[in-house]
């Protein structure tokens, strides 16, 4: 694997390996990684417990996407906080296997994510893209509604990735909003 930060989604249908875009969307990746590793304070699971492990893919639309990350399993749950969108011009819904944040409108990101089956350009500028599938798109295509997300394993390759601090990256995104709101 190339240097970088990866998320391995382990399901009963197999594994999905995603390269995360921590260099382009650091706050969003910081939130995801910190939740996955159990380091993010939230209102659902105690700190130290991995947030995504044992959740389900609560929404699956064939030929569109699979969605997970809802602690209630209904699409209405979140970690007890919301955060800003983080768009980057080079990150588009331009292929199958795009990992992005599910939301209910601007600045309503929490823990829910989706992975696409096909290009979905109408979602550009509405949902933060923060990774791409590099192995296991066949697993994405096989996941059915209600399937378990057994675990999410974060893999760090290279010195920069090893030293990257997910919490600091997320706090930086929140800090940027506070500065913008104060201006």
Regions flagged by a language model, labelled:
Residues 1-183:
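Cyclophilin-like peptidyl-prolyl cis-trans isomerases
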